[in-house]
Amino acid sequence: MYIPTYEDMLAAHERIKPHIRRTPIRTSDYLNELTGAQLFFKCENFQEPGAFKVRGATNAVFGLDDAQAAKGVATHSSGNHASCLSYAAMLRGIPCNVVMPRTAPQAKKDTVRRYGGVITECEPSTSSREETFAKVQAETGGDFVHPYNDPRVIAGQGTCAKELVEQVDGLDAVVAPIGGGGMISGTCLTLSTLAPETRVIAAEPEQADDAYRSFKAGYIIADDAPKTVADGLLVPLKDLTWHFVKNHVSEIYTASDAEIVDAMKLIWKHLRIVMEPSSAVPLATILKNPEAFAGKRVGVIVTGGNVDLDKLPWN
């Protein structure tokens, strides 16, 4: 198992800079007063495909040699990695095949197709996803770009934390959602070298809390088909992301679906940005654990904004 390095992250940033946005930081006096912390929201929902995953996907696609690239890329994803890989493949002019759960939000499916990705649907379970993908990859021969358990992807995701600490000085902690662990692993990779005094904290839905239970048990515990409003956080940890979680994450906090929806409303209202439920999990956990964040300078990664506006969770 190859563990990506800080140098891999730096190389990834140089590779992807022409194709991504250096996303802005947003703050809210109201949310600072409400939490007792100084919150700095890194708005990855402002990326062209609407999610941070464009970083890792672009690093993987543009790191392929011409012979590999000619065969295209393939992946399985609940949404954002699928759209971001399709976008990166479109930029390079190569094919992209994606396996997605049939229950994935229509907005995410539409985005994949808009960027030229070819979708094969599966049942909303890890086993169905992996079985369906094996068939698709055998038929297409595309390079497998795993949504998170891939050194190229983790190195790319780590560029978000690099920008964050360049934009905001003296962060005591960075909080990011955790599903499979790609973003949190990239954050650990970067901050362990660039800002080792900054704590990395993961935020997870209670109804899909396998990372939390794994963290407490000391080994990977996987749920096959969890259900939560945070549909981007349904996948389990894998060996590579588990390496970063067990060695570098300071804490994992969880929040209920109701708390996640309440936090999502607050962000929509006070930051005035469109973001999806998965992106609200960090604020939900900060609100639920105020003693852990009071008086601290906290970076919060808003991971994506691909939400079906006709199916908002408070409607």
Swiss-Prot record:
> What general EC class does the enzyme of this chain belong to?
lyase
Statement: the UniProt record of this protein carries the keyword Ribonucleoprotein:
no
Disulfide bonds, which pairs?
A: none
* Molecular function (Gene Ontology), one example: pyridoxal phosphate binding
As its record notes, the protein acts as a catalyst of: (3S)-3-hydroxy-D-aspartate = iminosuccinate + H2O
Per UniProt, the keywords (alphabetical) are: Lyase, Pyridoxal phosphate
This protein's superkingdom?
Bacteria
Enzyme nomenclature, EC number: 4.2.1.-
Signal peptide region: none
Q: Please state what is observed when this gene is inactivated.
A: Abolishes growth on glycolate or glyoxylate, but the deletion mutant strain is still able to grow on acetate, succinate or glucose with comparable growth rates as for the wild type.
Binding of pyridoxal 5'-phosphate occurs at N80, G179, G180, G181, G182, M183, T303
Q: Name one GO biological process term.
A: glycolate catabolic process
Relate the induction remark in this record.
Induced by glycolate.
Q: Which residues carry this modification: N6-(pyridoxal phosphate)lysine?
A: K53
Give cofactor(s), names only: pyridoxal 5'-phosphate
Task: Spell out the InterPro entries in the cross-references.
Answer: BHydaspDhtse (IPR054856), TrpB-like_PALP (IPR001926), TrpB-like_PALP_sf (IPR036052)
Q: Pfam families given for it?
A: PALP (PF00291)
The UniProt record lists the keyword Lyase: yes
Q: What further fact does the record state?
A: Iminosuccinate is a labile compound that spontaneously decays into free ammonia and oxaloacetate in solution. The beta-hydroxyaspartate cycle (BHAC) consists of BhcA, BhcB, BhcC, and BhcD enzyme activities. Overall, it converts two molecules of glyoxylate (C2) into oxaloacetate (C4) without the loss of carbon as CO2, under consumption of just one reducing equivalent and regeneration of the catalytic amino donor, which makes it one of the most efficient glyoxylate assimilation pathways.
PANTHER family referenced in this protein's UniProt entry, alphabetically: SERINE / THREONINE RACEMASE FAMILY MEMBER, SERINE RACEMASE
Q: What does this protein do?
A: Catalyzes the dehydration of (2R,3S)-beta-hydroxyaspartate ((3S)-3-hydroxy-D-aspartate) into iminosuccinate. Is essential for the growth of P.denitrificans in the presence of glycolate and glyoxylate since it functions in glyoxylate assimilation via the beta-hydroxyaspartate cycle (BHAC).
Q: What is this protein called?
A: beta-hydroxyaspartate dehydratase
